[in-house]
């Protein structure tokens, strides 16, 4: 990001985020807002975080994206993945997804499924978000940032 001229700064969830005993996540929205107001781009990643009564638990990057999008009223939401979008069983990018059941079979195991559920976890998390979002690959980051609509649209019922 720095090489592309983006004033990116890391925000490490272990140092700034926690779950309460009901598993609700507190996010550093004031700090994020301050960084953004000064022209910085906060960059988060999945991490372990303190969880009241549990020690630590995993906070996925997907959960961070949706939590911050909701709390900061994001105008656009995008997740960059290792593939150019959500792929169907033939390996083609699915244009849009509005419900999980219609794509569940294609979202079985992936080559990079992790503790957050891989692509299926991303789709489920974004379907629960009350706004449209996109999943795209690394080659489409510039297009997404320029306002284009690469990859797969995920929309679980927003008003848009």
Which ranges hold each PLM region?
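C-terminal catalytic "cap/lid" subdomain
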Residues: 1-160
